[in-house]
């Protein structure tokens, strides 16, 4: 089964074409403000370079946030449009779950965190021993998050691509797309119109209404 994976929830483009869990081609590139203008071009180039087109794809896996509001919208728009036009099943996964799946789980706990500004993050705490989130995904202050982390001891890995105001050492997030796909590919696909952004927090404009 050929699978198209897409994550534009940060200032990076993470995308790949896979045959089941084997990566055929992938892009892991920091695009910053060029993400909106270059993402689709890079994706089209990836398909072209591998002599493939969207008709070859049988499943789409898209990251639906949290993260950059603009980035999340870009990825969901691309994935939903392809899914609808080509009638391809689509699976959504949160960015925090993708980060957790890509972590080095030799530690007891994994803490994926995404900068939400003003000393807040989108974060969760995953128990690698019992295989469950003990702190669900949420918008949380760094101080509150790290107070919870201190209660768990030192066997923790903190993952982020952002510069956070913390004394903890941070492991850079580099997605293991093959492993992410392996863990989610058998989930039931949904109608593209049912795919929702997982913002966890309203935009400032919405908060001020």
Briefly describe each language-model feature range.
Residues 1-62:
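N-terminal beta-alpha supersecondary unit
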Residues 59-95:
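DPxDG-like acidic metal-binding loop motif
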């Amino acid at each position: 089964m050929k699978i198209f994976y897409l994550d534009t929830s940060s200032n990076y483009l993470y995308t790949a074409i896979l045959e089941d869990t084997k990566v055929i081609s992938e892009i892991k590139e920091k695009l910053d403000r060029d993400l909106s203008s270059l993402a689709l071009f890079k994706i089209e180039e990836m398909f072209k370079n591998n002599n493939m087109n969207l008709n070859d794809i049988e499943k789409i896996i898209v990251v639906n946030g949290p993260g950059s509001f603009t980035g999340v919208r870009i990825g969901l728009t691309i994935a939903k449009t392809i899914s609808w036009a080509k009638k391809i099943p689509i699976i959504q996964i949160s960015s925090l779950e993708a980060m957790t799946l890509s972590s080095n789980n030799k530690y007891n706990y994994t803490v994926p965190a995404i900068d939400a500004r003003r000393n807040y993050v989108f974060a969760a705490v995953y128990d690698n021993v019992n295989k469950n989130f003990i702190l669900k995904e949420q918008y949380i202050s760094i101080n509150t998050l790290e107070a919870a982390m201190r209660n768990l001891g030192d066997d923790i890995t903190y993952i982020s691509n952002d510069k956070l105001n913390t004394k903890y050492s941070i492991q850079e997030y580099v997605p293991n797309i093959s492993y992410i796909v392996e863990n989610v590919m058998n989930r039931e696909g949904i109608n593209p119109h049912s795919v929702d952004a997982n913002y966890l927090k309203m935009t400032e404009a919405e908060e001020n209404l």
